[in-house]
C-alpha cells in the first residue's frame, strides 16, 4: 500500500555549498567530501529530503533535515532514518541532478519483509510470524523501526532488516 508520494524540483545553482552544514547528516557529509560535483550533491540531497517530508504529509513540522539521510547503494540513493516517522518499510527513490535537481520519493507499506532474530515463542506471542528465512524470522507489524528495535532489544531479540529502509543510530 502506498503511504505517500513526494516530489521536489529546484535549480542546482541556487543551492550554495555552505548549505551542506545545515541539511546533511554525518554520513552524507562524508559522502559529500568525496564528490567533485558538490553543488549537485547538496541540491540532490536537499530535493530528496523535501520530497521525503512531502511524502510523509507533514512537511518539516517537528523534524529536521538531519533526521533522514540518503546514502548510497550501487550508486543509487537509499533512505536511512534516525527516528520513527510512522509506518512504512519501503522507500522508492529517484534522483536526477544536472541543471535542476528532481527528486521523487514513494513510501510504501508492504506486508512482511521485516526480519528479526530471536526467541520464536516470544516473536509468535508479539507478532504475526510469516516464515523463517536464512536471515531470521519474517514478521508482520505496524510498529515503526525504532519502536520495534527497542522492544526487540529489551527482549533479547534483534532487528535484522526493515524492508529496504536503513536504520541509523
Swiss-Prot record:
What UniProt keywords apply to this chain's record, in alphabetical order? Cytoplasm, Fatty acid biosynthesis, Fatty acid metabolism, Lipid biosynthesis, Lipid metabolism, Magnesium, Metal-binding, Transferase
Alphabetized InterPro entries for the sequence: 4-PPantetheinyl_Trfase_dom, 4-PPantetheinyl_Trfase_dom_sf, ACPS, Ppantetheine-prot_Trfase_dom
SUPFAM superfamilies in the cross-refs = 4'-phosphopantetheinyl transferase
Q: Which Pfam families match?
A: ACPS
Q: Which cofactor does it need?
A: Mg(2+)
Q: Which residues cross the membrane?
A: none
Chief location? cytoplasm
Q: Name the positions where Mg(2+) binds.
A: 8, 50
- Compartments, as annotated in UniProt: Cytoplasm
Molecular function terms in GO for this entry? holo-[acyl-carrier-protein] synthase activity; magnesium ion binding
Asked if the keyword Plastid belongs to this entry, the reply reads no
What family, per the record? Belongs to the P-Pant transferase superfamily. AcpS family.
Per its record, how is this protein called by name? Holo-[acyl-carrier-protein] synthase
Question: What species is given as this protein's source?
Answer: Thermotoga maritima (strain ATCC 43589 / DSM 3109 / JCM 10099 / NBRC 100826 / MSB8)
**Name of the encoding gene:** acpS
Amino acid at each position: 500500500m502506498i503511504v505517500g508520494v513526494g516530489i521536489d524540483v529546484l535549480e542546482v545553482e541556487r543551492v550554495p555549498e555552505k548549505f551542506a552544514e545545515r541539511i546533511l547528516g554525518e554520513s552524507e557529509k562524508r559522502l559529500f567530501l568525496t564528490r567533485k560535483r558538490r553543488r549537485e550533491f547538496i541540491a540532490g540531497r536537499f530535493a530528496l529530503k523535501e520530497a521525503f517530508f512531502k511524502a510523509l504529509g507533514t512537511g518539516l513540522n517537528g523534524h529536521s533535515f538531519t533526521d533522514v539521510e540518503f546514502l548510497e547503494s550501487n550508486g543509487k540513493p537509499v533512505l536511512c532514518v534516525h527516528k520513527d516517522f510512522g509506518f512504512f518499510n519501503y522507500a522508492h527513490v529517484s534522483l536526477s541532478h544536472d541543471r535542476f535537481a528532481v527528486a521523487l520519493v514513494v513510501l510504501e507499506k508492504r506486508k512482511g519483509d521485516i526480519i528479526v532474530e530471536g526467541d520464536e515463542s516470544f516473536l509468535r506471542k508479539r507478532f504475526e510470524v510469516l516464515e523463517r528465512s536464512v536471515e531470521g524470522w519474517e514478521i508482520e507489524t505496524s510498529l515503526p523501526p525504532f519502536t520495534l528495535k527497542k522492544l526487540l532489544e529489551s527482549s533479547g531479540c534483534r532487528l535484522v532488516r526493515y524492508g529496504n529502509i536503513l536504520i541509523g543510530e
